[in-house]
Curated annotation (Swiss-Prot):
Organism: Rhodospirillum centenum (strain ATCC 51521 / SW)
Subunit comment: Homodimer.
One Gene Ontology term from the biological process aspect of the record: protein refolding
Cofactor: Zn(2+)
InterPro entries: DnaJ, DnaJ_C, DnaJ_domain, DnaJ_domain_CS, HSP40/DnaJ_pept-bd, HSP_DnaJ_Cys-rich_dom, HSP_DnaJ_Cys-rich_dom_sf, J_dom_sf
Gene3D superfamilies per the UniProt record, alphabetical: DnaJ domain, Heat shock protein DnaJ, cysteine-rich domain, Urease metallochaperone UreE, N-terminal domain
Keyword RNA-binding: no
Name of the protein this chain belongs to: Chaperone protein DnaJ
């Protein structure tokens, strides 16, 4: 059974904002949550479906992959939600537990204990590469503005070697409870904002954040055969976590610059090559460039027309994680001579006078059909 469109599952438009997605998910999750529909298998399945849809659409990277490839973005080797294009594993992390705790922790008295640190944000970096780099692979460096752990406090956020203490308001749990009727309402602690710890003496360098802004220089390995839009994950190279929390990841988005000779079609390459009229008429050979830097010679049969295509097997792009290569397709364009000398013009006129019957079968056939059409119109 084919999966439903994720936007349809949540009942939102494709261009819905993050807030719209969250509101739609909260409403549906409250309606179909198993605790409210005990024993109802249909509701349980519906809850799983909307959870899966929200898990993908709430994440910018996974949503972009879904918008481009649909459900196929997470199948056929892409490894499910959290895998990237071309098989790279990006492990975005669902974050479903966060919204679950936010909704049902407060409503039903659930929720995780507060943590002393928060994970850093993931970062995106757009990198343009050449077609040659995509063909053979490359190693390049990027400079990324980010945040790193504060050296003064070793990322703790506390000044002078002191350590954070348990929040006295929530006793280190990160949440406070209040009884309302039959329900126990659990909310994020307003004193520590859910961290469970407070800093009495904040670090003067980072202001108690445990991290500072800095530009990092990183090396990026680009494998041979990558395509436009491929994403590469550099684990742990995102923003530093808050007060010693784990860092996020950095995602490199590749864009392949246009090439002056070649156009790419998957693993194949296409190239238009002009040839002289005389070569097309009499036959001959031409040398053409290839993506690996070598030259290939093509034999041009006599009578070759514009648009004729030659295939050079194995002269195309590399295939990711494979020794195979695509093909190179050469399309010839017969060039009409310009700026003829008087002598050249005379020779062409002599050629024309020598007789044209059978020399131009396509044009002769075309005009023969035109004459027939005119004759039919007169009748």
């Amino acid at each position: 059974m084919s999966k439903r469109d994720y936007y349809e599952v949540l009942g939102v438009q494709k261009g819905a904002s993050a807030d719209d997605l969250k509101k739609a998910y909260r409403k549906l999750a409250m309606q179909y949550h198993p605790d409210r529909n005990q024993g109802d298998k249909a509701a349980e399945q519906k809850f799983k479906e909307i959870s899966e849809a929200y898990d993908v659409l709430k994440d910018d990277q996974k949503r972009a992959a879904y918008d481009r490839f649909g459900h196929a973005a997470f199948e056929n080797g892409r490894g499910g939600p959290g895998a990237g294009a071309a098989g790279f594993d990006f492990n975005f992390g669902s974050g479903f537990a966060d919204i679950f705790d936010e909704m049902f922790g407060e409503f039903m008295g659930r929720g995780r204990a507060g943590q002393t640190s928060n994970r850093g944000a993931d970062l995106r970096y757009n990198l343009e590469i050449t077609l040659e780099d995509a063909f053979k692979g490359a190693t390049t460096t990027v400079r990324v503005p980010t945040s790193v752990a504060c050296e003064s406090c070793n990322g703790t956020g506390a000044e002078g070697g002191s350590t954070p203490i348990a929040c006295p308001t929530c006793n280190g749990h990160g949440k406070v409870r209040a009884q309302q009727g039959f329900f126990t309402i659990e909310r994020t602690c307003p004193a520590c904002h859910g961290v469970g710890r407070v800093i009495k003496d904040p670090c003067r360098t980072c202001g108690g954040q445990g991290r500072v802004r800095k530009e990092k220089t990183l090396s990026v390995n680009i494998p041979a055969g990558v395509e436009d839009g491929t994403r590469i994950r550099l684990a742990g190279e995102g923003e530093a976590g808050l007060r010693g929390g784990p860092p996020g990841d950095l995602y490199i988005f590749l864009a392949i610059a246009p090439h002056r000779f070649f156009q790419r079609d998957g693993a194949n390459l296409q190239c238009r090559v002009p040839i002289p009229m005389t070569t097309a008429a009499l036959g001959g050979s031409v040398e053409v460039p290839t993506i690996d830097g070598s030259r290939a010679k093509i034999a041009i049969p006599a009578g070759t027309q514009t648009g004729h295509q030659f295939r050079l097997k194995g002269k195309g792009m590399s295939v990711l994680r494979s020794p195979a290569r695509g093909d190179l397709y050469i399309q010839v364009v017969v060039e009409t001579p310009v700026n003829l000398t008087k002598k050249q013009q005379e020779l062409l006129r002599e050629f024309e006078k020598a007789g044209q019957d059978g020399l131009h079968p396509e044009s002769e056939g075309f005009f023969a059909k035109v004459k027939e059409l005119w004759a039919d119109l007169k009748d």
